[in-house]
UniProtKB/Swiss-Prot annotation:
Keywords: Chaperone, Cytoplasm
Gene: groES
Natural source organism: Prochlorococcus marinus (strain MIT 9313)
SMART domains per record: Cpn10
CDD domains listed in its UniProt record: cpn10
GO CC annotation, single: cytoplasm
Pfam family, any one: Cpn10
HAMAP family for this protein: CH10
Subcellular location as annotated: Cytoplasm
Predominant place of localization: cytoplasm
Xref: NCBIfam families: PRK00364.1-2, PRK00364.1-6, PRK00364.2-2, PRK00364.2-4, PRK00364.2-5
Protein name in the entry: Co-chaperonin GroES
Gene Ontology biological-process annotations: chaperone cofactor-dependent protein refolding
Quaternary context: Heptamer of 7 subunits arranged in a ring. Interacts with the chaperonin GroEL.
Length: 103
């Protein structure tokens, strides 16, 4: 089997899925204490980098996604599939797992 090179531009979400770049988690507490990786909260905010074509309706038409590339979103804590590309972290979510668009 040939190796596949993954990058953000080669990932195309299907259906109502959304590809989100995860925001950096806090490195220190408010008191200045450095946190080890095991103590950091899992981030729930990120920027949409790819969007699928939308959910297919019963009649075969597509329902357009409510979010677009560049939107900053808040999503469910344990939703989606975590993906690491080079040094950046991403999550592939179903649109229903997105709770809000953050301005």
């Amino acid at each position: 089997m040939a190796a596949v090179s993954l990058s953000v531009s080669t990932v195309k979400p299907l259906g109502d899925r959304v590809f989100v770049k995860v925001s950096e988690s806090e490195e220190k507490t408010a008191g200045g204490i450095l946190l080890p990786d095991t103590a950091k909260e899992k981030p729930q905010v990120g920027e949409v980098v790819q969007v699928g074509p939308g959910k297919r309706n019963d009649d075969g038409s597509r329902q357009a996604p409510e979010v677009g590339v560049g939107d900053k979103v808040l999503y469910s804590k344990y939703a989606g599939t975590d993906i690491k590309l080079s040094t950046d972290e991403y999550v592939l979510l179903s649109e229903k797992d997105i709770l809000a668009v953050v301005n």
